[in-house]
Amino acid sequence: SSAASDVYKRQGVSRASKINRILLPAVLQWLGQGQNPDMGLLNWRKLEERFGTDSEYLGFLRDSNSAAQRLCHVLSNSRFLGDALNKSVESVTWLGDDDALIARSRESLDVQCRSSLSRNADGINDFATSMRAMRRHEIERIGLARLSGVMDETACLTGMTDVYDAIIDAALTWAIRYQTSAMGLGEPPAAIAAIGMGRYGGQEVNFSSDADMILLYRPADGTDEQVANQFARKVVDALRQVLQGPTTLEPKIEIDLDLRPEGKNGPLIRSYASCREYYSSWANTWEHQALLRARFVAGDRALGEDFLHDIADPLRYPISPLTDAQLGEIRKLKARMEAERLPLSLIHISEPTR
């Protein structure tokens, strides 16, 4: 291919080019075994252009027992990871060390988050950059581990969920502290909790997942409800700026609040009392079912546990069996979701002829 010839043309007599000449025959063979060899070769070329003049990079690939072959497998099978590797030569070195590919523990992630919180108490840009870079870094690590066969799918899903949990908890902590100071208050006028929903609540986060959440608050003792509500809304604004606002060039961490009470028509955050009233009086059957994956993820744990125990559990684990009307609603929702996911051609094929 033209990309391969270009690689050969750039080879000179330097140490780096000599190493590259040794590697390239095997590299081309390994890239050819991937799902998209052309993409793999293009990614290899980009890496060479960025790091190839550094003989240590190529020397590492030559001397490692597994790194070069793993790298080729990644480059020819994952556009996401190929692009990510082009930004960090450190990530390439992980491919030669199984221990470096293992997902970090939640405790280790929390230590890094606390360090960033202490360094960036007032600077939203620096804090947002550190959190988003951390997410990119750790998701990249886990993705490389999965494609290298170091971690299975279950461990990867758990590891990625831990990354999201740690970062969202730190971002919420930062937003609460920031708004408490901005409003000239000594203490937060409300406790705030985030409840994971959907795939995020079910600990099935992947590379491109949004974090589905419900946010709620509870006024502190003796605090005016209006003050607590104003504070909570400003905290949500700050949280969204940290995770997905235009504050940094690092990729956004998308949060999705559409599963909240009243959906897109409802407030982004509402009080515990308001949530309780809504779910007991107005929620549809599908909203009860959506609570099956609800779990506490960030913020005030006591508030989160109260929501799960007092509001979610009676609805998602009802004592009485579902009524015919409720079962009918669930079947309709299931049929609609399946229709939305199926290609149009398959829907037409499955429809009976008239």
Regions found by a protein language model. Give the residues of each.
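A nucleotide- and high-energy phosphate-metabolite-utilizing enzyme signature
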Residues: 1, 5-346, 350
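Ser/Thr-centric signal marking residues that sit
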Residues: 353
